[in-house]
Amino acid sequence: MIISINKKKARLRRAARTRFQIKKLHLIRLVVHRTSKHIYAQIIDSKNALVLTSASTVEKEILNLVKYTGNIHASICIGKKIAERALMKGIINVSFDRSGFQYHGRVKALADAARESGLKF
């Protein structure tokens, strides 16, 4: 139990450090959060603290596309969807905020799918 608390504290410390640097530069950021069953992505304007668009595996539109929401295939769908919604709003350049999670697996799949769909990090 102690190990998981320390891992979470370390992840949150990494996330805070990244967010501070991004907020200081007033960039639009693509924030990713993952749980064991779902993955969430939001595009946030750091200057005004507004969520510009979002996508997650909780949405019915995504649930119809994937069989299970906690895998790489679901992350790829979310990456494509968030890029599509961002491009519709005229957002092309974003800063990637992985929320302290390792850039591996589902987080990497989401980032790669968003890049392939037209977002620039």
Curated annotation (Swiss-Prot):
GO terms for molecular function: 5S rRNA binding; structural constituent of ribosome. Keywords: Ribonucleoprotein, Ribosomal protein, RNA-binding, rRNA-binding. InterPro entries: Ribosomal_uL18_bac-type, Ribosomal_uL18_bac/euk. GO terms for cellular component: cytosolic large ribosomal subunit. Signal peptide: none annotated. The keyword rRNA-binding applies. SUPFAM superfamilies: Translational machinery components. The keyword Ribonucleoprotein applies. GO terms for biological process: translation. Belongs to the universal ribosomal protein uL18 family. This is one of the proteins that bind and probably mediate the attachment of the 5S RNA into the large ribosomal subunit, where it forms part of the central protuberance. Part of the 50S ribosomal subunit; part of the 5S rRNA/L5/L18/L25 subcomplex. Contacts the 5S and 23S rRNAs. This is Large ribosomal subunit protein uL18. It comes from Buchnera aphidicola subsp. Baizongia pistaciae (strain Bp). The lineage of its organism: Bacteria, Pseudomonadati, Pseudomonadota, Gammaproteobacteria, Enterobacterales.
